[in-house]
Structure formats: C-alpha cells, structure tokens
Amino acid sequence: MLQDKGLSESEEAFRAPGSALGEASASNAANAPEPALAAPGLSGAALGSPPGPGADAAAAAAAAAAAEQTIENIKVGLHEKELWKKFHEAGTEMIITKAGRRMFPSYKVKVTGMNPKTKYILLIDIVPADDHRYKFCDNKWMVAGKAEPAMPGRLYVHPDSPATGAHWMRQLVSFQKLKLTNNHLDPFGHIILNSMHKYQPRLHIVKADENNAFGSKNTAFCTHVFPETSFISVTSYQNHKITQLKIENNPFAKGFRGSDDSDLRVARLQSKEYPVISKSIMRQRLVSTQLSAKPDVSPLHGAHQALQHYQYENGAHMQFAAAEPQDLPLNTFPAQRDSSLFYHCLKRRDSARHLDLPCKRSYLEAPPAVGEDHYFRSPPPYDQQMLSPSYCSEVTPREACMYSGSGPEITGVSGVDDLPPPPLSCNMWTSVSPYTSYSVQTMETVPYQSFPTHFTATTMMPRLPAISAPSSQPPGNSHFSVYNQLSQSQVRERGPTTSFQRERGLPSVCERKPPSPHLNAANEFLYSQSFSLSREASLQYHSGMGTVENWTDG
C-alpha cells in the first residue's frame, strides 16, 4: 500500500522533464525552510530557547541546515564500475521482452553519508538519453531517425523502502529485480521502453515524510546518474561483442551457450572427458569424409568414420552409424530377393531353440533330465514368420531347408538316429484346441491335397497304414511318429514321469493331408512341430505328426 501510494504520487512528481525533482534540486535553498517547518517536534521549547518569533525562526533555520546538509552529504558509488565501462565502450545493449527481462550488469550501488536514524526511500527511473532512434549497421550504432513518443514514466521503488540510513549503508543496494519490457499494457509494474532507443537510468534517494511516503512538494531528495550505465534497448543482441561479454560475465546466460562455436569452449570450462562436437564442425567432417570416400561407399559408412573418435550427444546416431546395413531394423517395405535375406535357415533353427513358447509352460511340465533340444528343433511359429517381411517371399527357394533340411542340416539338427523318441511336446496333442496366440497363415506355395481319414480318435492309437512313396523317407527318422494319446506307462518308458494329466476331450474325426507334390521332390522327411490352418477348411491339420510303417501300442 505504501509503494502504491508512492508510485501514484511520484508519477506526478516525475511525469515531465523539469519535474519536481529537478526543480527541488535547482532551488534547494528556497524550499529548505518549508519541510523543516512541517517537521513535528521542532519548536523553540524543545530546543530550550526562550519563546519568541526570532527564536523560532533561528531554530527552524538550524534544523533546515542540518536536513540539507544530510541530503547533500550522501555519496553513492556504482558497484562493478569497471564491468560497466567495458559494456559502455562496446555499446551496452539491454534485452526487452513482453514478459520483462532483467538487466545485466545489474544496477548495484554502495551508499554512504546517510543519517543512520532517518528513513529514506530509494527508487530508479529510466529516461530517454536523447531524441533519436538507432540502428546497428557496419558493426556500429547509427542514428536512424527521430525517436518515438516516450512511454509513460514509471518508477521502480526498492522493495526495502522505506528504511533507515543504517540499513541502506550496511550492504550493497541491488536493483537486480528490475525488469524491462516493451509491452505498453504491462500490468506488473515493469519499466516500459521502446526498442532501438537509448536510455539512461537514474537513482533517486528521497527522505521519507511523517507518513513514510514521498512525492509532496517539499520533499528532500537527491539524484545520482552514472553515464556508463546508459544502454540501447533491443529485442535481440546486435553486437557480437556484447553477446560475448554477457556470456563471459553472466552466469545465467545459458541460452547462448548452446550455439555452434561455443560448445568446445564450454566443454573445456566444465572439464568434460569427451568434448561435445558442435554442429558446424560435425557438418564439415561429414562432408569432407563423404567427398574423400569411394563412390560405392554409402554415406552411413562415412558418418561412422567421422564419429568413431568422438562422442555425440544423441546415442541413437552412434548406434546406427556403427551398425552394418544388414544389421539395421527391418523395414516395412518389401525388399528385393538378393538383399532381404537377413536370417537363413540355420539361424532360424538355432534361434527357435531359445523361444519361450506359451504352450510348453501351459500344458506341460518339462522334466529337468530332458534336454531343450527335444522341444525346439523345428522352425519358429508362424507368428514369428509373419513378422519378417522377407520370410514369406522366400518360402519357395528355402522350403526344402526349412521343413525337411538337406545333408549337413539333417545330421546337425534333426538327423540324430540314436536319440530316443521325444516326449510329449506342445504340438503332439490331437485333442488340444487351436491356440489363440498363433496367428496361422495359409501359404499358397505349399498347397495341401485332400486325403482320406486314416485313423479315428479312440482311447488307444490303432495301427497306422504306411504312406506311399516310402523311398522319399530316409531311414533313421522313426522317432518322428504320431502320438495321438499316450498312456502314463508309455511316458515312463520314454522319459521321466510328467505330472500333467490331459483333461481335454478328443475330436471325433481328424483329417490329415499328405505333403504337397512340390515338397516330395525335395523333402527327405516330413517337417515337425508346426501348425497350419486353412481358412476354407473347418478342421485343424496337425502337421507335426510323422508316420511309421509298423506301429504297436504295446
């Protein structure tokens, strides 16, 4: 409330040039008796002089002289004067924004010569230094025309006002919270300025009256002006020298430290182990590396050579630069046949061993003595096959390798003769309903032909007839056999006892279709552990079942 009152009254006193402050400073002697007379408690009786008009006049003159001497004896020194001189020599610029921006260097002063018990009010106003508008051209400021009409003058009263002289002289008086704005409708009390105009800050020290206020006609005050604090208001820095001075001296000037050429300097100041490479240097290195590289070398390799000795801020760029083209993530666009073979058959078979199939954990409890190789010897499920865009397009040239294997693959992966028949696995059940986690895709390149029903679902497995063309089935694969339903005794003979008991019902009829004639020419035995579902058929084909010539249940 005190500051509001002071602002309203001070605006009347400092409104126009030649205001009450200037008039009072010009005629201090004439106005001196009036505030002395208005001061309470200053009478002849109080001073101990005999009553009378002459005594009262003498006492009033002595009190006025003491008050005048107190105001005149106040000395003010500018803090960081050398820094202000550096800015002044280069042409000080101050940023103004709509929201308001603080000044740098901050306006700080050291005050001496005050009466320790008298209360004072300290305030600042910023007035135009001339009537010109400026522009920055050829690395110097030039007059561009006549100044725009001045904004309504505002005063910034120090938050500690009013305070005793002892308080002001105890430490530096800082006006660092003062903000400059170009918003003519600013409601926050910031100093309103016009851009590209020159201004001069002024410090006023006013003696507070009996109401701890100022602005009356007879108020005693003094004004201090430092020419090195003059500046030109700008919305962005024009002179690079001023920008450099702000960066070197302002610890809060973080907005300028992310530029291109200052990255290395800031890295050295912060003593980083790996310097941050600026964008301009990185761009030059990339261009020079690509120009010196061979025409058939991709820009990705050139970027890798330029970045191998440095640490870039974004780790993702380093990962892609260090990776080879075939190791990059798969794109969603179909690639050509020569460049789309990211995984061959052996890799897919090896990676299939480490798959964590949900059906294994859900329907089986694998005994610890049985190796993982019995469960994962087949191609991966169809949902993984459909994730790779290049897999379906390469089914025809790789179907012999994927489903049956040839030569080295049979002996290394699934051609072991001395292995016992595998225990119950996830795709040996004829009574389990299709799993919802498998999204099965019908492959037109491997058509199936209708085949009559060769067995029915009963409690025990009947004898199965041998399939024609036995010459296409190599010896030693009898362990790839059909398991419709095995009793608990059969499980004990072939492996450790499992605690799982099937509770599902058996379907009435299961049809099985023989492999395609396209596969008979290349396949040496039927593929195992895979599901296929035809959208036109209403039954499920369990293709993970092989055949045996002579089957006995006992």
Curated annotation (Swiss-Prot):
Record's compositionally biased regions (Low complexity): 18-34
Pfam families documented for this protein: T-box
Signal peptide residue numbers: none
Biased composition annotated in UniProt, kind: Basic and acidic residues: 1-14, 491-509
GO biological process: angiogenesis; cell fate specification; embryonic hindlimb morphogenesis; embryonic lung development; limb morphogenesis; positive regulation of DNA-templated transcription; regulation of transcription by RNA polymerase II; skeletal system morphogenesis
GO molecular function: DNA-binding transcription factor activity, RNA polymerase II-specific; RNA polymerase II cis-regulatory region sequence-specific DNA binding
DNA-binding region boundaries: 78-258
SUPFAM superfamilies: p53-like transcription factors
Modified-residue entries (Phosphoserine), positions: S516
CDD domains assigned to the protein according to its UniProt record, in alphabetical order: T-box_TBX4_5-like (cd20189)
Region (Disordered): 1-34, 488-509
Keyword Phosphoprotein: yes
Principal place of residence: nucleus
Location in or out of the cell: Nucleus
A GO-annotated cellular component: chromatin
UniProtKB keywords: Developmental protein, DNA-binding, Nucleus, Phosphoprotein, Transcription, Transcription regulation
Domain of life (superkingdom): Eukaryota
Summary of the function given for this chain in its UniProt record: Transcriptional regulator that has an essential role in the organogenesis of lungs, pelvis, and hindlimbs.
Protein's name in the database: T-box transcription factor TBX4
Species whose genome carries this gene: Canis lupus familiaris (Dog)
